[in-house]
Amino acid sequence: MNQKQEALLGLPLTNAEREWLTDRLETLSVKESYQLSAAIMRSGRLQELVGKSRDELQATVLRMKPDVAVEAINCLMTLHDYEVCYPAGSYDALGRFFLQYESGAPRDTLPFVDLDQLGRRYEDLHPGLFIGGSYVVYPTKEPEQHYTGHNLAELDDSDWSVRLKIASPEKPEGVWVRLPDYSMVNDDKADEVELALLDLKVDTIQDCTLLDARCILPEVENLVSEYHELADLIYDGNDLGFLLDEQGQGMPHFNEKFHAALAYEKCTRLGAALDIAQNLRCYDFVPREDVESFAEKFLESRGIEAGHVSLLSECMDRESYRRYLLAQQGYQQHAASGSFIRRNQLDFCYERSQPPTPQAHFEMKL
């Protein structure tokens, strides 16, 4: 570590670091709490983060030294490197888990397998920790260190779609769920929702109450009031997660276009956001990186020779002309990204939301 890094780590925690750590620790899902416990047991450090109430966590973060904060943030950024196997609270159960979900062997193999021995061999090949009725597999290599002590704003904590806090009569204070839940695409292998239900001591989502909900899309507000059924919110939260994973199946500038479309439509509801994501073809889009050359490309599209376009560009107010063309063609600027967007004439398919009234659509276009 060089002198500059040592000096940075010697400074008190910034407000941003405290807020990041407090929020991340307060919203840990049940699955993530298993992963964090395994990470801490593996390293033998950060014991102060385990088993704390909200107030205790805040006090812990306030007392935290900068070098510990850096380690804690890096640990929290790499929880996904720890695989949670459930149910697998014993060697016998771990062997059964492997046989059912990972081996590919037919079901009629089960009576002939020594599950305890299989579980122990699995542990030999995949070192980990038994915790909470699960087996958490350690990463095969040291997790990448994302945080250096001064790049908090650059950290990419975006591998989620919706966070839910759900409660049960047995646990009225509730637990967090971090969507998407991948059980449906992983042969029903237990994931976020099932682990939360286990902790809440209930059998189904219908036995739970929604206490809080947060969406990764800053445009989307008040999920609790938008959804009357928790199962519907989980379904849509999963769909958003899968959609963000796919990135429009390789669509160029997907995130930039998606957020520009959300702003263009003044979208504040998750259902409408999902419809917009499925209908991005209905928007013409000029990404920020193409804005500067928009005027030149327009002139070229009119059949003007490249040499003449270059000459005109040298002798005109390019920025004013560019803005004139964009406005004339009905584009609106997305302030956050600097890109431009407009609706085209393709039919928009509404599945989770209602089309705007003619008056509302007219006002939106003004």
Feature locations, PLM:
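Short, surface-exposed polybasic-aromatic patches that bind anionic ligands, especially phosphate groups
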Residues: 123-124, 130-132, 319-329, 334-336, ...
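A short beta-strand micro-motif
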Residues: 161-169
